[in-house]
Amino acid sequence: MDLYTFDSPEGIPESKYIPLDIMSDYSIGESIARIPELVRKAKSLNMKALALTDRTLSGAIEFYLLCKTNDIKPIIGQKIAFGNNEVNLLCKDLEAYKILCRHSLELQDANDFPMALSELRITKEDCEHFICITSYCTSELLTSFGDNLYRQVDFADVKNHPEKFDNLDTSHAVITNPVRYLEKEDYAALAAFKQSISENPSPTYPDNYFADDSEIIPFLTENNHLELAENTQRITEQIQFIFPENYFTTPEAHNRMRESLPDFEDAENQLRAIAVEGFEQKLNEFDNEQEAWDRLAYELEDIGNHHWEKVFLFHHEVTSWCRQNGIEVGPGRGSAPGSFVSYLLGITNVNPLKHGLVYERFLNSERLCYPDFDIDYDYERLPEVAEHLKEKYGEDFVVRIATYGRLKCWQTLEIAAKYLNYSAEEILPIKKIILDFCLPRVTFSRLLDSSSYLYKDVIPHWDGVKLQGFLRDKKNEKLVKIAQTLEFVKHNIGLYASGYIVTGDSIYTYIPVLKDSKTGWIYSEYTMNILEDVGLYKSDLLGLWELTKLKQLTEAISKKTGTPFNYKEIPLEDKETLEAFAKGKTTDVFQFEAPGMKKFLKKLEPDRFSDLVLMNALYRPGPFDYIPIAIDNKAAGNYRNDFPGCESILEETYGLPIYQEQIIQMAQILAGYSLAEGDMLRRAMGKKKLEVLMAKKAEFMERAPVTEIVSEKQAEEIFDIMIPFAGYAFNKSHAVAYTMMAYWEMYMKVHFPKEYRKIIKNFREELEEEDF
């Protein structure tokens, strides 16, 4: 999450008024004020505190961290419907936040179907942890909150009706100006947004902007009720809500993550026993048994040192259950296939020793990281996997993750045009230019900048002239203003497609949650990035159609041959399969069916599995330009060696460092880095920050002579050559695993063409005759 530090104001006295009724765009359809804008505004006004009172706690952590970064006291609150009344509950302390988390589902129901405070099971003892602000101080609220109850005096209301000050007990009253948008002129933008999402939108009020001292203090002074602003300060002083020190630092978040995972009895010994059993079962696969044993011991020690055993055991249980129930599991994804322990546990199906994969690319003791397993499952049976987790651990222990859709510029243009009664003929041509020639995420700042690369290199000249003319036309000024104001505003909430949070205790003890009315799944109010800060473990369950295809092919082939067929036992050096790749006959073969890929395969003439892995890694933006060089080097049989001592690790890529793992290993060979240090060097090279690169370069040059392979001068030259490769280098672990699936498919296509053709028809209607 980006934590911006906004400019501090100069010459502005500290604000006397603190806004205590603010809704952000996390309250979808009720507010268009984004949290960064709210905090920036508060800082510009020299406010030392700020409240957030959304319908949920979805924005609480983002708000808290951004306020803290800008030296503003964050006041976390929630707006809740009680009967016919609405209240703002402000958290006085951390316990109040935990209470809201525990009751989050009930509070969701309360906002949908208002109920009495007693029905929410919030006790009088709970109420002691809150400040309650409401327009209607009922006897129930007074009994529950006592001195923590304040009457809300609406600034716009008393400004228009000063007589409402008469007989007002101001000792427990505060002035508020509910904030639903930032500036006065943003009123139209909120009205337009409401109209776009509802046929019967709720009213939009012209006074719900971010008011400040310049308006409120003179008015209260004139009416002899300055104490209403002073009470906002008084409430602020009562707020002692703070997360523990270092709570959001990575080490602390990881400690909480370890503690929050489901428990496994004697996890360290259990992991070791399962890994050793897997080792013994796969013993005949290892060319060097001692090397394999040393790798196992090293990984187990590292996993144990960082106490990540439960993560491995969790994924071992899931993948084992899938195999027992006939659900296909992918060979691996991302950097996980680089772990030998993952392979022995059956989490992945790639032998990292055979393919030269590096464990430190997955888990690195030099940087703070956790075992992030992304696992593919049979697409059609993915729901069964999720249901298994829910049944095994409980629905309060396995929950989905929220994701928020944000408005893009072309969407906001449509919204503004509809609100201002533009015709379709006026707006559709402009929308078409944006969608045809610009990325969907293009921003207004780019569109309004006539010197932008969009108008030089992307949008055709006359279309650019038309677009610029429309956006700068005086008569469209209001439309553009509304559209710009709505850009990036949250407009819907959904479920993150693959992410699941798994905990050992009820999720309510950690975070606030909601319930999806369509699926019945409980899901976190926080997004994925926030959950990592909070310290909860995310497991990705990814559905992959290729695994569905492989399952169906396996069943068809087994039926034909009369014997069980296991595609995972297919030899990776089958001559006919490699020849089919070399001829470019890859239609309907996973990751290899693009026309350009077919062309390069014919030129490369792959004759080993590693050639296919290489092409898979190269055929993507960035390393694409190295394809002709790799082809020429393979054809020549010899090539220039820019990296002395690294011949053995670069042989499979014909002298080019194409894989991230190769960069790591080269640092070890040339400069004596550990593999963990080599991974840190690779990451630094990839980010291309000049000051970091210069420091790493000096370090590399200093360490290189120790290996006696290159001199300090040679090390400088080699470092400069490595930098562009490191920026484009691809994760070999991922390339090997996904190429393996492609190879399995091609093998079945070559050796069982009728069965392959029949199954493929289920996935697409038209087949190319010449490709079979």
Show the residue positions of the predicted features.
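Alpha-helical scaffold/interaction cores of sigma-54-like transcription cofactors
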Residues: 2-772
